[in-house]
Regions:
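Active-site-adjacent substrate-binding region
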Residues: 224-227, 231-247, 396-439
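Active-site metal-coordination/substrate-binding segment of hydrolases
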Residues: 65-163, 198-201, 309-312, 320-323, ...
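Zn-dependent metallopeptidase/amidohydrolase metal-coordination segment
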Residues: 9-12, 331, 338-351, 358, ...
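His/Asp/Glu-rich mid-to-C-terminal helical/loop segments that flank catalytic regions of hydrolases
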Residues: 222-239, 268, 313-320, 328-331, ...
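Acidic/His- and Gly-rich active-site-bordering loop/insert found
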Residues: 3-104
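A conserved active-site cap/scaffold subdomain adjacent to cofactor or substrate pockets
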Residues: 253-329
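Fold-level recognition of mixed alpha/beta catalytic cores in primary-metabolism enzymes, strongest
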Residues: 135-225, 237
């Protein structure tokens, strides 16, 4: 049953709800891509769908706007799929269960995907509305932004004529983003060897963390469960003979992990004492930002052999010594994170432990330096680092007619000026700016809270205001 069908603007919320009914996590975008194509076909709109499942939909200028420069509307169709503990929904095949409470839209037990589904819905609503006035529109819907911006990277931009772009992938109403960090994914691989070891098998878990976006919320002082797990294992290694069996935590490299687990072979009494000690320490250290943090242990079973002594120590050393979090603040823009990294995914295979980092910096040489630091540390441990999904930063344009227009429209509508700022998170604007020289771009969006977590929510009133702003901006683009 429709939950949002009575909300205005009806087109925006209808398309958003239709999108939420289609599974569309990163890497699972074929169905939603085809849905967008069907939308274009039904309205006689020209479109392009590439092999990556990116979709570009074109709409001609309305009367009186034929000579105006085309405008690009841009958002990504994939979402981060995260669930609260105990949620049984299979997000690969099931749609979301939307919840409307007052002004707030959320999804029961899962991420909402307002990042960036609301951009998709707003662009579709504009393409669908014959009553609006606007220049020629080129609406770009990219795939796999959340896992490395692979859609934007692979899109053939030769089909585009526009050189001004409204990117609707920001989460704070009243803030226009005009510059962002570049980034890359760094995958650390540590080979391991297994051998028998006589000790009880135990499960040690660090859970209950808040998590969040590894760019936008890296400065919130929230703990990383995998890094804390390393601290627990290091403390246990100092008390007793320890053999790691496996370590795991996190699902996305761009999300701060909320829980991590290790299987170990060790003395149960020592493990109980260390876990109690570290639980108390973490509760004190993170009482403000992660008040529900818990360190626990219990007996466990596994068919896996433990790691040998050398491999076990290397794993503990890796989790203890690898850098994580903020590495430098910007000297140019007070309060802006310049360089950071986040250990987002930790997994163990039969013969290797893998740690995937999201590395970000607004200074390209700082980003490369941090990757090199990871590489040097891993090589000392006998491991290696590979990088992929690298994307450029988006440089600030001192002269931006589009920014000036958007600031004026916002000020006229709201009665005060918006904030214009740079962010530490990555945006596809950087890739498009590199591929379309001279591109004039502004990023904005409605209020979305706690994106990339199962607590994600979206403000209805904020969507209404932002959509009205976009419609008015298009009207003024003569």
């Amino acid at each position: 049953m429709a939950v949002l069908n009575h909300l205005e603007p009806q087109r925006v919320f209808r398309f958003f709800e239709e999108l939420c009914a289609i599974p569309h996590g990163s890497g699972n975008t074929k169905a939603v891509s085809d849905w967008l194509v069907d939308f274009a076909k039904a309205r006689g709109l020209r479109y392009v769908q590439d092999q990556l499942n990116n979709v570009v939909i074109f709409r001609d200028a309305t009367p009186g706007y034929e000579s105006a420069e085309p405008v690009i509307l841009q958002g990504h169709m994939d979402m981060v799929c995260e669930k609260e503990p105990g949620c049984t929904k299979d997000m690969a095949v099931e749609g979301l269960d939307l919840v409307l409470e007052g002004d707030t839209v959320s999804a029961r037990g899962t991420t909402l995907g307002g990042d960036d589904g609301i951009a998709v819905a707003m662009a579709m609503a504009i393409l669908d509305d014959d009553s609006l006035s606007h220049p020629a529109i080129e609406a770009i819907f990219t795939v796999d932004e959340e896992t490395g911006m692979y859609g934007a990277e692979g899109l053939d931009v030769s089909v585009l004529k526009g050189r001004r772009m409204l990117n609707m992938d920001s989460e704070d109403e009243g803030i226009f983003t005009v510059s962002c960090a570049g980034g890359a994914r760094a995958d650390c691989c540590l080979p391991i060897t297994r051998s028998a070891f006589s000790a009880p098998v135990l499960e040690i878990a660090v859970t209950g963390l808040v998590g969040g976006h590894s760019g936008a919320e890296i400065d919130k002082g929230r703990a990383n469960s995998s890094m804390l797990l390393g601290r627990v294992l290091c403390a246990l290694e100092e008390k007793t003979d320890l053999r790691v069996i496996s370590v795991c935590g996190g699902l996305k490299d761009n999300a701060i992990p909320t829980g991590s687990v290790a299987l170990v072979a060790a003395d149960a009494g020592a493990a109980q004492a260390v876990c109690a000690e570290m639980d108390a320490a973490f509760k004190k250290e993170y009482r403000v930002n992660d008040p529900a943090i818990t360190v626990s242990f219990r007996p466990a079973e596994t068919a896996l052999l433990p790691l040998d002594e050398s491999s076990s120590r290397s794993v503990v050393c890796m989790l203890t010594c690898l850098p994580n979090g903020i590495q430098a603040m910007s000297a140019d823009m007070p309060g802006l994170v310049q360089t950071s990294l986040n250990l987002g995914i930790l997994t163990t295979g039969d013969d290797a432990v893998h740690a995937s980092f999201s590395v970000r910096s607004s200074v390209a040489t700082q980003k490369q330096m941090l990757i090199q630091r990871l590489r040097c540390l891993m090589e000392r441990l006998g491991g290696s680092v590979s990088t992929h999904g690298e994307y450029p930063g988006w440089e600030y344009m001192p002269q931006s007619p589009l920014r000036d227009l958007m600031v004026q429209v916002f000020t006229d509508q709201y009665g005060y000026a918006p904030k214009v700022e740079a962010i530490h998170a990555g945006l596809e604007c950087g890739l498009f700016s590199a591929k379309l020289p001279g591109l004039d771009c502004v990023s904005f969006g409605p209020d979305l809270k706690e994106i990339h977590t199962f607590r994600e929510s979206m403000s209805v009133a904020s969507v209404q205001r932002v959509y009205a702003m976009v419609v008015e901006a298009l009207k003024r683009m003569h």
